[in-house]
Amino acid sequence: ERLHAQGHPIHVVDALAINTISVADAASLVTDVLRERELRGVVIVAHSKGGLIGKRLLIEDVDGRVAQLIAIATPWHGSSLARYVPGRVIGALRPEDAAIVALEANTEVNARITSIYPALDQHVPEGSQLEGATNIEVAAVGHFRVLSDPEVLDAVVAAVGR
């Protein structure tokens, strides 16, 4: 709401819904939406797995549509806890998952990423610092609770266009 109030158009990709598809498939879906809506200079604001999708978009952005990614509580290095949760959706967040390894290896786009993360994230014990990115740790505690923290909201607004 604050970004919209400052004149930034907001586009939600409803098709992602609860985000149970792979990072690659989700990035492809978002790319299609960006093209259909003829969007350029896009700043993606994403949470958790959404940050992984955003990084893949930056890497594969042959049209130059995405300017920046602001990621909140993103498991850039995976989550060791994903090993203990059955199913492919969470399992894809294991540190050794091929998609995680590939995204981690590609550092060329990291300078265009702002990673905002809580002081303690019970779902991402490895943390959300990303080498080469602008890293902002906030005092909030919790993987989801961070989304409503005023300090995080301030950091997102400040990061747009940085």
Predicted regions and their residues:
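Serine-dependent carboxylesterase/thioesterase catalytic core
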Residues: R2-A15, T20-A111, H123-V124
